[in-house]
Amino acid sequence: MTTQLEQAWELAKQRFAAVGIDVEEALRQLDRLPVSMHCWQGDDVAGFENPEGSLTGGIQSTGNYPGKARNATELRADLEQALRLIPGPKRLNLHAIYLESDTPVARDQIKPEHFKNWVEWAKANRLGLDFNPTCFSHPLSADGFTLSHPDAKIRQFWIDHCKASRRVSAYFGEQLGTPSVMNIWIPDGMKDITVDRLAPRQRLLEALDEVISEKFDPAHHIDAVESKLFGIGAESYTVGSNEFYMGYATSRQTALCLDAGHFHPTEVISDKISAAMLYVPRLLLHVSRPVRWDSDHVVLLDDETQAIASEIVRHNLFDRVHIGLDFFDASINRVAAWVIGTRNMKKALLRALLEPTDQLRQLEASGDYTARLALLEEQKSLPWQAVWEMYCQRHDTPAGSQWLDSVRVYEKEILSKRS
């Protein structure tokens, strides 16, 4: 530990103590908040089922930065490099297309054995795993419908895929001793004016009920459902809208997933957290950065990321909110993208934990909005960076931009050699 860091740390402790904050307790609380990193940043959502296939479902990964992972070994190596540069507890979020098998496996036939290597790797790296059925980039999703498909056989294929995915998710939780959150997102929708908006939603409702009919121990598996405003090719109508899934999660008491990019650009999910928590048992958050649309840019330490973190901390939702990331930028170093986005989420959580929330709440309750605003703004100038640097030091990770040096070395020695 450098003397400079020690001095900054001691000064920070004093400054925060003056506003009633115990920084040691804040760091202990930060270690209760794992962030689930998404595997698909590492290979532009290609997966191992058909790596050369097209990405469909109304989503896009833009850019062609060299060095993307081409197989599971490379993807896990890239993840390990990123994990070394991110302090505190982490999880990994997998999609079904990241299965490993010597022979082709139909999506409705995936089994826990196809993810055994991921489980062993997670154990070695002390990670929990989360999961997602992959209801896109497949011939049977090419016409824009999956769980709401009008063809019963195709619809059943996707139902069976989701049911098989739940068994994989439960396997993760059982093996790793921490529940796997399995999120269902489907791209179903229409490009142009839709006459019958009800029938697809009726089919989706019935399909989801069949999907979740098998019961699993909640200590192993948690169901979540995710809405979206629109996607490319589904601009006019999305079957799984916010209202649909809010109603579904409330009536079935599943978790509800809120993705930062899946709403109108003037909406923010930070404002939805407290409302949804009154009705659903759990929330899954997909923290992302939409630029004009659901572009899935790398997460910044911006106002909305901070607001999301503050909502979690202010309302003590540690045990009811699951924090995941969802972005995929192929225009920059993919390992760096993971590190930047995940560190920013953790920084936002730390800043939220260093807020004198009780004092601010009292000011608000008494109607002293002047002092509330003044203290909120003064809080931004307190030396939270020194606390972050100590947190990094204690977790043996670089405190500042030094982590970029490690990424550059990895890029030169490993990534640059990939064709």
Curated annotation (Swiss-Prot):
It is found in: Cytoplasm. Mn(2+) binds at H262, D294, D296. Binds 1 Mn(2+) ion per subunit. GO terms for cellular component: cytoplasm. InterPro entries: L-rhamnose_isomerase, Rhamnose_isomerase, Xyl_isomerase-like_sf. Its cofactor is Mn(2+). Pathway: Carbohydrate degradation; L-rhamnose degradation; glycerone phosphate from L-rhamnose: step 1/3. It catalyses: L-rhamnopyranose = L-rhamnulose. GO terms for biological process: L-lyxose metabolic process; rhamnose catabolic process. HAMAP family: RhaA (MF_00541). This is L-rhamnose isomerase. The gene is rhaA.
